Amino acid sequence: METMMNKGVITITDAEFETEVLKAEQPVLVYFWASWCGPCQLMSPLINLAATTYGDRLKIVKMEADPNPVAIKQYQVEGLPALRLLRGETVLESTEGVISKDKLLSLLNQHLNNN
């Protein structure tokens, strides 16, 4: 069940990961989160900002950690919130924990301006 979330952020499940992420034509930022995760509430507005800023060059998906153990294991997510920037099956960037707006934008600029 693909649903649009705030400003172009798509909520996906393990079952949709291959289609929505691995087969995407553009880079994909995967945001792993949980409803019980306080720091995730700090990251969510930054994810929405990234969608607004880079939506023409970047696909952004969010995955709730608990119901999606396959992606969590495959991408070695050990803490939340976590971000994985992928192009196809290649992980370009990997972060865990809250990062600043400047760090997020810098990380994305580094990869998206080289397209």
Regions found by a protein language model. Name each.
Residues 79, 84-115:
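Non-catalytic, surface beta->alpha helical segment in thiol-disulfide oxidoreductase systems
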Residues 12, 32, 44-51, 55-69:
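Thiol-based oxidoreductase modules, predominantly thioredoxin-like and allied folds used
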Residues 74-78:
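A short glycine-leucine-enriched loop at secondary-structure breakpoints
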Residues 9-27, 69:
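A short beta-strand-turn-helix
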Residues 25-26, 33-36, 79:
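Short pre-active-site segment immediately N-terminal to redox-active cysteine/selenocysteine motifs
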Residues 37-40, 83:
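The canonical Cys-X-X-Cys-His
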